[in-house]
A protein has these predicted regions:
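Extended, low-complexity cationic-aromatic segments
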Residues: 1-87, 199
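Mobile genetic element proteins and their domesticated derivatives, centered on retroelements
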Residues: 20-22, 61, 67, 86, ...
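C-terminal domain-tail junction helix/linker
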Residues: 32, 167-212
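RNase H-like polynucleotidyl transferase catalytic core
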Residues: 44-51, 123-145, 160-164
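Active-site proximal helix-loop segment of RNase H-like, two-metal nucleases, encompassing DDE(D)
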Residues: 69, 138, 146-165, 178-183
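Short, basic/hydrophobic alpha-helical segments
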Residues: 80-101
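Intrinsically disordered, low-complexity and often Lys/Arg-enriched segments
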Residues: 91-92, 98, 121, 204-212
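Acidic/histidine-rich, metal-coordinating catalytic segments
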Residues: 97-111
Length: 212
């Protein structure tokens, strides 16, 4: 936990950008009957029946100090999707960076080994060296600022039925562009000092050192 909190204290550095990465599934649901539009005194209505069209995955890449975010929509959630998104982060979003600091959850797909399972060894090694990973602790996903952005995405864009991955991609891209135009940042205020005080119960108990 303290590792992530110390990283959040770092000042903005374009050569060493700090990004937060998280992902979430989105179930694709299509209406079986056309929804009824709203009229004077009557809200819009949709039938309770719907058709399941599978599940898509959304990867959120958020740079809190710059107010930029990039959302990638994929059909599956595997190591290959994560590695491919991270390659895009390296070579498309931050090609000039010397090192990219990444805060992310400790999922089984979020591993440097994913690069070797997706790319040739030389390319995998190049990508591993592009990143400096800082993992949130178990049950500590709230430390990941990308989770805040995903919550905003759900509230503002995904709180309704979306029938297919094409529509989902279009809706997410429109949300991303608007939010980036507004340069929405996150000012993180929870510090290591706060953690040692307010979350003291999560720390191992100090038993002292005995001199011999």
């Amino acid at each position: 936990m303290e590792d992530v909190l110390e990283v959040y204290k770092l000042p903005y550095d374009a050569h060493r950008p700090l990004i937060c990465m998280d992902e979430m599934p989105k179930q694709l649901l299509a209406d079986k009957q056309e929804p009824l539009p709203c009229q004077a005194g009557t809200p819009a209505r949709e039938d309770y029946e719907y058709k399941r069209n599978g599940v898509a995955d959304l990867f959120m890449v958020f740079e809190p100090l710059a107010g930029k975010r990039f959302v990638e929509v994929t059909e599956k959630r595997r190591k290959i999707e994560w590695a491919t998104v991270m390659k895009q982060v390296s070579d498309v979003f931050y090609p000039q960076a010397e090192k990219i600091l990444v805060v992310l959850d400790n999922l089984n797909t979020h591993s440097p080994s994913a690069f070797y399972e997706t790319f040739e060894p030389e390319e995998a090694r190049r990508l591993v060296e592009r990143f400096e990973f800082h993992f949130t602790p178990k049950h500590g996903s709230w430390l990941n600022m990308a989770e805040i952005e995903l919550s905003a995405l759900v509230r503002q864009c995904l709180d309704r039925r979306i029938p297919d991955i094409q529509t989902l991609t279009q809706e997410v891209q429109a949300w991303q562009e608007q939010r980036n135009d507004e340069v929405v940042k996150v000012l993180w205020q929870f510090t290591t000092t706060d953690a040692r005080t307010k979350l003291k119960h999560l720390y191992p108990k100090f038993s002292g050192v005995t001199d011999y």
